[in-house]
Amino acid sequence: MFLYTENFDEQKEKAMEGLRKALEEDKVDHDIIPLLEKINALQNYFTTSSCSGRISVMEMPHFGDKVNSVWLGKWHREVRLEEVLEAVGKHRSGQLWFLVRSPILHVGARTLEDAVRLLNLAIGLGFKYSNIKSVSHKKLVVEIRSTERMDVPLGENGELWVDEAYIEKIVNLANAQVRRFKGKLKRLEEEIEKLQED
């Protein structure tokens, strides 16, 4: 027997303790909570981390430097042009980026067979970048990810390279992506109980 299978119940208990704490501290995206509850109610799965997807405006010293980056605006929903313009107006230094990130969930599975069942369900529902993230002695983790993503440079060192009309266009595109991935999350929430053992 694989150690991750032997350790499953202990790892799930630890993860549920972490989730309870995160919920108490309001650190969980509200619209993904029903899905997390359904996954965690399944005997052979548990969630370790999640994000319901987001639109953001970020200031980076240089591209890829996440450690020293600053959020100027972050939304786990559709966004209004005015909100984005307000965030853009805070830009002072470094590079200014408009970003969209699809939902991501990390789910522990009891066995490799369980992991593959979840992976096949997720991919079938449009989470095309889903994969088995890690297999270690402690746990077996499936990463559920979709394809929606935008990385749009807007300016640098306080200078804006684009006008408001352009920002309005990318906000509309971003909101369309949000609607798409929120729909996928809803379908996953509706279908996840198929993984319940009889």
Swiss-Prot record:
Top enzyme class: transferase
Record-level Gene Ontology MF annotations: tRNA methyltransferase activity
UniProt KW keywords: Methyltransferase, S-adenosyl-L-methionine, Transferase, tRNA processing
Short name of any one Pfam family annotated for the protein: TYW3
Alphabetical list of InterPro entries matching this protein: Taw3 (IPR022908), tRNA_yW-synthesising (IPR003827), tRNA_yW-synthesising-like_sf (IPR036602)
EC number: 2.1.1.282
Stretch forming the signal peptide: none
Reaction catalyzed: 4-demethyl-7-[(3S)-3-amino-3-carboxypropyl]wyosine(37) in tRNA(Phe) + S-adenosyl-L-methionine = 7-[(3S)-3-amino-3-carboxypropyl]wyosine(37) in tRNA(Phe) + S-adenosyl-L-homocysteine + H(+)
Repeat is among the record's keywords: no
Lineage: superkingdom: Archaea
SUPFAM superfamilies xrefs: SSo0622-like
GO biological process: tRNA methylation; wybutosine biosynthetic process
Function: S-adenosyl-L-methionine-dependent methyltransferase that acts as a component of the wyosine derivatives biosynthesis pathway.
Entry-linked HAMAP family: TYW3_archaea
Family: Belongs to the TYW3 family.
Protein name: tRNA(Phe) 7-((3-amino-3-carboxypropyl)-4-demethylwyosine(37)-N(4))-methyltransferase 1
Organism annotation: Thermococcus kodakarensis (strain ATCC BAA-918 / JCM 12380 / KOD1) (Pyrococcus kodakaraensis (strain KOD1))
